[in-house]
């Protein structure tokens, strides 16, 4: 069993426990009553033909399987406000509890604190989680191609669109990019971390980004340690970067996001 397989199995067990407390029918009622989803596609520059600005998806993450504890984050809402003030286009909130110490309570607190689009960051293995995300006010969900069959990827993508949300469709190989494109993904992430082994290879992004249709929003995931990595991703075709560890471990995340945005814009300007 790979690391990803193990995480997915845990995510399914935890989801089933929640389903015993809150039925799918109840979630659908809550989703129907929720405020309309914010346009994460537009927030990430999807409708901007120039795409001269690098967008930052700033992540709230207490721990990770590869690094262990990262930050205690006693008040995720306060951190989210700092992210928003720094110019984050989207805020990602981990809700997976076993490996990342996240929760839907964290997500709810952040949702009340900021108006920017939110990514409910979890390991989606069932449509229940998609309805759950919308019921809690999510605007964007994560679909990992390696975790899903083609039918699941297609069906989950369609349900996400029907609920007014967008999906960040995560890939790590050329074959997974082909599958994402076949599922009409509009926001495609390239994770330079292999979730089956947790190894990081930053060169993966440059080798794969050229295979993503130009109309898609291209997100570089993992491996951002500082502005040099941001410049590298932006120069290699990224429209956005997803950053977690480098922000939660920084005493001034607001300033760091502004630095990343500026560095990315410079790199984008140099490539065109």
UniProtKB/Swiss-Prot annotation:
GO terms for molecular function: indole-3-glycerol-phosphate synthase activity; phosphoribosylanthranilate isomerase activity. It catalyses: 1-(2-carboxyphenylamino)-1-deoxy-D-ribulose 5-phosphate + H(+) = (1S,2R)-1-C-(indol-3-yl)glycerol 3-phosphate + CO2 + H2O. PROSITE patterns: IGPS (PS00614). InterPro entries: Aldolase_TIM (IPR013785), Indole-3-glycerol_P_synth (IPR045186), Indole-3-glycerol_P_synth_dom (IPR013798), Indole-3-GlycerolPSynthase_CS (IPR001468), RibuloseP-bd_barrel (IPR011060). The keyword Transmembrane helix does not apply. This is Indole-3-glycerol phosphate synthase. The keyword Amino-acid biosynthesis applies. Keywords: Amino-acid biosynthesis, Aromatic amino acid biosynthesis, Decarboxylase, Lyase, Tryptophan biosynthesis. Gene3D superfamilies: Aldolase class I. HAMAP family: IGPS_B. Belongs to the TrpC family. Its EC number is 4.1.1.48. Pathway: Amino-acid biosynthesis; L-tryptophan biosynthesis; L-tryptophan from chorismate: step 4/5. It comes from Arthrobacter sp. (strain FB24). SUPFAM superfamilies: Ribulose-phoshate binding barrel (SSF51366). GO terms for biological process: L-tryptophan biosynthetic process.
